[in-house]
Amino acid sequence: MNSIYIYCISEKLDELVLTGINNLPIKVMQYNELSIIYSSINEEVKYIEENFFAHENVLDELLKIDVTILPFRFGTYINEEDVITILKEKYNIFIENIFFLKGRVEISVRAIWNYSNVLEKVKNNFVAPQIGISNEKINNYLNKKMEDYKLNESINQYATIEAEKIHKLILDNGIEGKYILMKTDSMFFNASYLVKKNKINDFSSRIQFVVSDFTEYKFLVTGPWPPYNFCNLLI
């Protein structure tokens, strides 16, 4: 049974002269106002660096020609005979996503903290809870457990407050975004923003404002990327 490896769904395209995973040629299948960008495969796609970068390169090339795409995650493939059925069944959802994402790209923003400094700052305002038990050994053990728990809770609360402040400063009219708290020893804020292509410079200026306002953190900004985090694709 033949399968196809899917890179993305896009606005209507005629053809693409590109190679993808396993050095396979890129093909275009049209359905009404949509195109599915794929490669025909008859073997398992290996999860190796070359294939991952080949997948990303196809999406990057499509971004360069200014076409709206709905990107699929690396490693997505289906039976060839199911393609048209899926396009028919989910056509309206795909069109809605295309319309929503038209003229926009995803930009990633990450905030990196010095965990030791944060820990010290939190400890300066931290009052350790006390449990009163007559058995000294058990009492000390429980107090230490409670202290560790409450301290971690305080750090999480601190990270949440800081992340929300950063997120609110970045958001502006026409920008949508979402973030997750990482709470690692290095990165605590990992966000994605959907930015209009003609507003990327404005977005960069806004990030510089945030950087100057939060000098205790380092910021890593990457993109533009295909809008992985802002399209609703389930096949």
Tell me what each language-model feature is.
Residues 1-182, 186, 201-204, 208-235:
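Long, contiguous binding/interaction regions
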Residues 188-190:
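Short, solvent-exposed beta-strand edge segments and adjacent coil->beta transition regions
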Residues 194-200:
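Helix N-cap motif at beta-to-alpha junctions
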Residues 152, 192-193:
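A short, structure-level motif marking secondary-structure boundaries and short turns
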